[in-house]
């Protein structure tokens, strides 16, 4: 790596995350005035040592100074000067150094002092910390040591400048995270040598050496800090290897003005890949503007949420006319546009969207700036039509398609024809192997098979209770003794409800309140019928419907019937009753609070699964990066291809 070795600092006094002598010496060699050095160091020390702020806020303040330079005035009345603490443009011009056994005093006098195994200093600023373990000791021990060190009673202030927090051993290799990264989210770097190349790391004796050489090579280390760090709504995040190589590949395409497709599987961080690529475009392409197009309101909301979470203002266009007006102006630089509903049609009405765009086009229309168009979920059937029409309206724009689902044969041919070849791929099996997502277990259940066969009922009971002791089985048998009668007499939905309730009583994660489940129904009406059935069981108050439906008196106009409630009336009544019971208020006022209801039940489903065990859905919550994860997914709906893949990805996330 060619770092300078600073020595063993076990007995050295005053070890800190900012070593003033080293930083001052580097700045002097750069020709920075002494007064500016003093002021810049003061600002850096102040940001890093502000004990009134959380570690996250201190670290973010330091990162801003490293990334964008320290703004100082040489004297009163003089213009502001930027003092750069790192040379981003020429990485090899920085002083990379390593100290081992860096003894740091604990914040609490009663606590033990700590001694990180190795600290990476760049120009005297601690940017990386490493804990090494023997090959017989798990890397997890090193990760937990890092997490302990960040506790307020130990050496938390030392971490205010750190970007990489790492642990490793010779057999398992290196794991990396950043400040406050939970153990399960520590990452492993993965890289293959390009054809015909023989990098130095390829000859490394063990995975630890190889991954250190890949991750901590001078240029790579600074590039990762400069281009691939994000502070996302209270959580600092680093990129995974697939995000890094995906963005790098896209950068190369952009330089050549060639579009293409980024296919990164569900759950592998596609939204942040979009953020990092967008930020790079803005900094490296003159007059750059980025437009992100989606065809689902949930995706549109989520894209706005993720960009605002990383402090980037994004304008959500209200209509096709609004989009045209914004493109015809020089601001804003970042926009997202939903293919809106038109004439009562569903979301994703491409024809209506394009018609409105064309009607809104002034005679002299020309999109201002250098425009880059991202099309989310580009595998969908209509993306070709959209792309061709948008290309006519925006002839000089560059298009990049994003997808997280496997492209089937027809979709693949169409998507490649429309957007160009793959820029980068990261597939489901790779993500499972890397531990980014979990593999799935699938069980097909045919409820009707039990109706007339007592033997099947006994087999079903035996399979369900495998692993339970005799006492537990006896108690369940007593409770479910009438199961054969129940299954023989009830209609199909009631049988599904009984089946799920049995799981709630026998599956460990569902029994102990740590797990939850989603039931995918074929229609909103069927979802309401399911809810009505569950409301009569022990899941009452712990079950909710989340769909796109919003009860309105207009929905039931002309629906009265002498033969009883129509489907629409029944759906309307069940929804109103569910909302009224949740908010403990009259149905007339509660029915206007669907969005608030959805927010609250989602939060309870995630944070308190024991109190919200089951969500009944149709399409909503099955797609998008912030759709909640679940332990079990029950599908009572015909699903295939992309929709099925996105749905099952609700149950393979690490959280």
Q: PLM features: residue spans?
A:
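ATP-dependent helicase/translocase motor core
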Residues: 2-289, 298-314, 330-333, 340, ...
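Conserved RecA-like ASCE ATPase "motif II neighborhood" in helicase/translocase motors
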Residues: 334-375, 380-389, 599-601, 617-619
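Conserved helicase ATPase motor motifs in RecA-like P-loop NTPase domains
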Residues: 266, 379-381, 393-410, 435
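Interdomain helical connector at the RecA1-RecA2 junction of SF1/SF2 helicase-like NTPases
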Residues: 204-207, 412-514, 531-538
């Amino acid at each position: 790596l060619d770092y300078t070795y600073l020595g063993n600092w076990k007995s050295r006094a005053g070890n800190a995350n900012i070593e003033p002598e080293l930083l001052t010496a580097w700045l002097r060699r750069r020709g920075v005035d002494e007064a500016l050095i003093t002021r810049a160091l003061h600002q850096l020390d102040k940001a890093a040592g502000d004990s009134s702020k959380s570690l996250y806020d201190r670290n973010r303040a330091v990162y801003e100074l490293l990334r964008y330079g320290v703004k100082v005035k040489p004297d009163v009345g003089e213009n502001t000067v930027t003092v750069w603490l790192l040379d981003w443009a020429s990485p090899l011009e920085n002083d990379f150094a390593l100290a081992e056994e860096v003894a740091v005093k604990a914040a609490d006098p009663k606590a033990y002092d700590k001694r990180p195994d190795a600290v990476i200093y760049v120009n005297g600023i601690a940017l990386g910390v490493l804990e090494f373990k023997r090959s017989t000791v798990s890397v997890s021990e090193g990760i937990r040591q890092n997490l302990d060190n960040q506790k307020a009673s130990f050496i938390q202030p030392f971490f205010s400048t750190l970007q990489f927090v790492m642990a490793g051993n010779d057999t398992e290799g290196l794991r990396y995270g950043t400040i406050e990264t939970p153990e399960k989210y520590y990452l492993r770097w993965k890289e293959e040598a390009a054809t015909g190349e023989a990098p130095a790391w390829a000859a490394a004796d063990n995975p630890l050496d190889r991954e250190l050489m890949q991750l901590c090579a001078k240029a790579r280390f600074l590039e990762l800090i400069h281009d691939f760090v994000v502070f996302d709504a209270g959580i600092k995040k680093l990129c995974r290897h697939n995000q890094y190589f995906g963005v790098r590949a896209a950068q190369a395409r952009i330089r050549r003005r060639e579009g293409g497709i980024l296919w990164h599987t569900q759950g592998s961080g596609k939204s942040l890949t979009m953020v990092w690529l967008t930020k790079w475009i803005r900094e490296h392409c003159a007059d750059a503007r980025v437009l992100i197009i989606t065809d689902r309101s949930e995706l549109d909301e989520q894209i706005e949420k993720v960009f605002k979470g990383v402090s980037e203002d994004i304008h959500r266009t209200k209509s096709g006319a609004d989009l045209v007006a914004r493109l015809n102006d020089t601001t804003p630089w970042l926009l997202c546009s939903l293919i809106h509903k038109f004439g009562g049609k569903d979301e994703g009405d491409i024809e209506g969207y394009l018609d409105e765009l064309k009607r809104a086009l002034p005679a002299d229309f020309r999109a201002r700036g250098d425009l880059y168009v991202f099309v989310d979920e580009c595998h969908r059937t209509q993306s070709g039509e959209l792309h061709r029409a948008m290309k006519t309206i925006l002839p000089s724009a560059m298009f990049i398609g994003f997808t997280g689902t496997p492209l089937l044969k027809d979709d693949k041919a169409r998507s490649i024809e429309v957007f160009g070849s793959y820029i980068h791929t990261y597939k489901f099996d790779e993500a499972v192997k890397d531990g980014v997502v979990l593999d799935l277990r699938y069980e097909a259940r045919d409820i009707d098979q039990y109706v007339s066969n007592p033997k099947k009922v006994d087999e079903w009971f035996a399979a369900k209770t495998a692993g339970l002791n005799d006492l537990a089985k006896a108690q369940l048998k007593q409770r479910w003794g009438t199961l054969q009668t129940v299954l023989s007499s009830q209609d199909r939905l009631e049988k599904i409800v009984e089946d799920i309730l049995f799981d709630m009583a026998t599956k460990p994660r569902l029994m102990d309140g740590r797990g939850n489940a989603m039931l995918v129904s074929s229609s909103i009406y069927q979802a309401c019928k399911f809810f009505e059935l569950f409301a009569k069981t022990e899941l009452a108050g712990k079950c909710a419907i989340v769909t796109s439906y919003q009860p309105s008196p207009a929905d039931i106009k002309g629906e009265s019937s002498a033969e009883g409630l129509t489907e629409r009336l029944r759906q309307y009544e069940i929804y109103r009753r569910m909302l009224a019971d949740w908010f403990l208020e009259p149905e007339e006022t509660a029915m206007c609070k669907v969005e608030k209801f959805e927010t609250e039940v989602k939060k309870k489903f995630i944070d308190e699964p024991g109190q919200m065990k089951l969500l009944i859905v149709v399409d909503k919550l099955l797609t998008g990066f912030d759709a909640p994860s679940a332990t079990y997914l029950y599908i009572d709906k015909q699903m295939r291809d992309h929709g099925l893949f996105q749905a099952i990805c609700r149950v393979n996330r690490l959280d």
